[in-house]
Amino acid sequence: TGRKLYYISAEFLIGKLLSNNLINLGLYDEARDALAAVGKSLSDIEEVEPEPSLGNGGLGRLAACFLDSLATLNLPGDGVGLRYHFGLFHQSFEDGVQNEKPGPWLTAHSWAEKTDITYPVELAGKEYTARLYKLAVTGYEGRTNTLNLFDLDTIDESIVHDGIAFDKTAIDKNLTLFLYPDDSDEAGRRLRVYQQYLMVSAGAQLILAECAARGCDYHDLADYAAIQINDTHPSMVIPELIRLL
């Protein structure tokens, strides 16, 4: 059966997906011509597609490139991360002053598909339910892998106010609102740790569940799964996997 790679990262800067998926599936020209036949432009549609706010810089782009290459090379490799609602933030300048606002991208037609799969995650003595979303990663004329994204059903976007301010202590409502929330105070630092733990605990449970579905004996886990940690954010997956086993 071979081993499957799980690439755990706090960021996945995957960019807009419509044109990329059409090209990888060999359907770009067909889609462009079909739209042109009814007086529409594919490029206009590409312009209004919201970009998934799942990453910010080089770390996220590296993760996205790895996933793209794995799929193109027909190698079994899935990503594991968080389904941020607003990403980092949307920056604008008014009268020479920087303004930070939420950058919403999630819609009813998001590429990330909601599943019925959930995992319990305990934070500060309270149990939360991590919901799995799956986003298809298409390779160029290759296989399709998956970016597994975790979120809480209880997240409340309405608590964000005055730009990107929010109650950092309301974990059930804020946990996946932003990528890299402000950590200048203790509440912010705790929130970041909770984010990272949600990602690695749910991710580790996903890995073990998929391994079990393939008939894996956990003593032979290394023959079924390889885990890549992208920077320090997912490093808690090591003790968490030990704890679960």
Where are these regions (language model features)?
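A conserved ligand/cofactor-binding region detector
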Residues: 1-245
